[in-house]
Amino acid sequence: IGRTVASLMRQNYAGPIHVIVVDDGSDDGTAAAAGDWPNLRIVPGSLLPGGWTGKLWAVNQGLTQVNVYLPDAEYILMTDGDIVHGPDNIAQLVNKAESEQRHLVSLMVKLRAQSFWEKLLIPAFVFFFQKLYPFPWVNDPASPTAAAAGGCMLIRRETLQRVGGVEHIRDQ
């Protein structure tokens, strides 16, 4: 998480960047590892209620914090805690959203594969994801099907509010 937060705080982006980390009670020292940055808020996660998956429950708690502490944020970046972002990542995502008038943009980040099983399964996951949701197809505004890589998604706040947040997909 420390490398993720650092990569977000060091973005070449003209706008303000605020990071909210939900510490879901893991024993990996999330709060300490996240570091001490201006505009970083670490919030303790609450127990996982029935009907929610862990990741979406953490996202929902983070979004609650955004609504309280960043009510004027135009965009919200939802990202996994093990992704190291390139220095222009946020600027590129915002530029794509604005230039193409998209409500949500995502990117398939390079996933770290260190163990034998990660090296075996991660490429297969990406291959099958691309087969199920061909990138040109799901990126076509005229297509009835859309997909996003859940590890890095930038969404317009108004769009997220209009669809009711993540609660309606909480068990997926």
Regions found by a protein language model. Give the residues of each.
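Short, well-formed alpha-helical segments that are part of the catalytic scaffolds
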Residues: I1-R10
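A conserved acidic beta->alpha catalytic loop
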Residues: S7, A14, D23-A32, S46-L48
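Cell-envelope/extracellular polymer assembly enzymes that use nucleotide-activated donors
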Residues: H18
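A short, conserved beta-strand element in the Rossmann-like catalytic core
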Residues: G25, D82-H85, L111-R112, L154
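Acidic donor-binding/catalytic loop of UDP-sugar-dependent glycosyltransferases
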Residues: G29, T79-K96
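Long helical/loop segments within the catalytic core of UDP-sugar-dependent glycosyltransferases
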Residues: P44-Y69, E74, L93-V163
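Donor nucleotide-sugar recognition loop
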Residues: A146, G165-Q172
